[in-house]
Amino acid sequence: MDDQGCPRCKTTKYRNPSLKLMVNVCGHTLCESCVELLFVRGSGSCQECDTPLRKSNFKVQLFEDPTIDKEVEIRKKILKIYNKREEDFPSLREYNDFLEEIEEIVLNLTNNVDLDNTRRKIDMYQKENKDTIQRNKIKMTREQEELEEALEMEKHENEQRRLHLQKEEQFQQMMKRKNKQELLDQLETSHLPASILLAQHKGKSVQAEMQVEKPRSFKTDTFSTGIKKGHHIASVPVTKIEEALYQYQPIHIETYGPQVPHIEMLGRQGYLNHVRAAAPQDLAGGYVSSLACHRALQDAFSGLFWQTH
């Protein structure tokens, strides 16, 4: 980060830690002072690529690579146009193709690849899907409002819970001070032994703690995302494609050698007589001696029947 700097005035973050770099739609950076100086009229051209820019479009650089800031801004603009959802497509494959098209457009605009055709494609899509874009935009706005309302409600409930716990804690502290003062008064005035008074005080304290009202649990009907508990989101089901059930077919590998005995038959046929037994720590990991023996036999038998023609 220390080598980041303004390409015009050559000021770096190493020499000026409070340097604020700004980035525009072209992806090239300028410091805040240079932006104020060059765009005093509200508009101007980029010092590196001569792209016409507006002063109001400059934003603080968030990432070390300004290209990422450029990609983020481009993606925001594209997603406002390409705002279809999965339920707008008859199949999952078409929805995935739609997402892939978005990524291709963002990639082209970010890296300045085939800009004319890409912008032409965006304009054509915007004209053909004007109604769908507007409908989804209204739907997103409504959902955003519902989410903000749910978050505000959750925040209010958390505040009420905090105040309730605070009052409960203050009440308990007040009762402790009161009981302590009563004990001191009894020790001064009573003729009973101190041990009996302390035992009585301890019993009263336990009863008082048991009688203290437990904090009420604030049950909510919705999650923080706005989804009601116990409810399901209504969505268009994905079209089910009827296909034949999968049938397992054993894999046959031609080894050009004798058939290797099954792993369960190795001990009966004497193959494990001279194989080191597995240690307890090996067994814990699932290893048994027959596995290594079976693999060694596969390597030994492989290619014994091979004949060159």
From Swiss-Prot:
Question: Where in the chain are the RING-type zinc fingers?
Answer: 6-50
Task of the protein: Stabilizes the cyclin H-CDK7 complex to form a functional CDK-activating kinase (CAK) enzymatic complex.
Name the UniProt record assigns to this protein: CDK-activating kinase assembly factor MAT1
Q: Which domain of life is it from?
A: Eukaryota
Q: Which GO terms describe its molecular function?
A: cyclin-dependent protein serine/threonine kinase activator activity; zinc ion binding
Q: Which NCBIfam families match?
A: cdk7
Concerning Pfam families, the annotation shows:
MAT1, zf-C3HC4_5
* Principal place of residence: nucleus
Under the heading PANTHER family, the entry gives: CDK-ACTIVATING KINASE ASSEMBLY FACTOR MAT1
Gene (UniProt): mnat1
The opening ranks of the lineage are: Eukaryota, Metazoa, Chordata, Craniata, Vertebrata
Task: State the disulfide connectivity.
Answer: none
Start and end of every UIM domain? Answer: 142-161
Cell compartments where the protein resides: Nucleus
Q: Which UniProt keywords apply?
A: Cell cycle, Cell division, Metal-binding, Nucleus, Zinc, Zinc-finger
What's a GO cellular component annotated to this UniProt protein?
A: transcription factor TFIIH holo complex
Kindly indicate whether the keyword Zinc belongs to this entry. Answer: yes
Biological processes per GO annotation: cell division; DNA repair; nucleotide-excision repair; regulation of transcription by RNA polymerase II
Q: Which InterPro entries match?
A: Cdk-activating_kinase_MAT1_cen, MAT1/Tfb3, UIM_dom, Znf_RING, Znf_RING/FYVE/PHD, Znf_RING_CS
Q: What start and end residues bound the annotated signal peptide?
A: none
SUBUNIT field? Associates with CDK7 and cyclin H.
